[in-house]
Amino acid sequence: MPKLIGAAAVILDSEGSVLLVKHSYGKNNWDLPGGKAEENESAEETAKREVLEEVGLEVGVEQLTGIYYDPNYDMHHFVFIANNDNNRVPRPSSPEILECRFCSRDELPKPISDFPVRGMDG
């Protein structure tokens, strides 16, 4: 059983574009907002907290779209569809986030991790 749990959120705007964040660490990949669960935190709670920490949005989690295993970290990643209830504009709100923006499937930036593409397919 994997020791770590992670969660991410697929947040779409009114045109169906997905919110992506660019991290300041690692390979500077574009990714879905999300991260590692804290002790005794559910995957859904993790997704909500990480979105708030990374881009300043309070979101509602609607449904689980997929669970993906990352053997490099022995971690399960839970990916949820979430909504931006207040229609607020996302802004980087953590030093670990360089940039955030909504991107259509046809305009996904590079380099990009696997999770945004998988999440959009969910």
Predicted regions and their residues:
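Short aromatic/basic micro-patch
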Residues: 31, 58, 102
